[in-house]
Amino acid sequence: MLQKLIERRRDEEGFTLIELMVVVLIIAILIAIAIPTFLGARTRAQDRQAQSNLRNAFAAEKVVYTDNQVFTTNTATLSGIEPSLNYVNGAGVSAATDAKAIYVVTANSDGTVVLGGKSKSGTCFYMQDSANAPTQFAKDTGCADVATTLTWTSAW
């Protein structure tokens, strides 16, 4: 009986140091690939959150426009329509620290409104609408004020 146990022990094999190092190397390579992908997905998600918040704020502005035929900068009115966002008057989008802060930059008597918001990734997004023109979009990583030249397009 003892002889059989000794023979069985000799037949047992473990992993060599080289095999363990190869496994560790493979895991390290997979992690090196996965982390940048994860971080990119996180940035895109933060940007989409800011864009979604802007679209919701814009829908609130459209409700006001439908009722009054003019856009508003009145943050209390907008909060009454869409209370999940924090409305701020002014063009200080670059100073935003709250992802739910929507800056009502302008609401002109000519029927133009500009809304701005900043994502947690640091990119600022803007929406502009005019009574006589389609909605336009802009984004800026430097968070320029609207008074400066932004490139307005039909999509972000």
Regions found by a protein language model. Give the residues of each.
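N-terminal leader/signal peptides at the extreme start of proteins
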Residues: 1-15
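Periplasmic/extracellular, small/polar-rich flexible segments of pilin-like filament-forming proteins
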Residues: 59-156
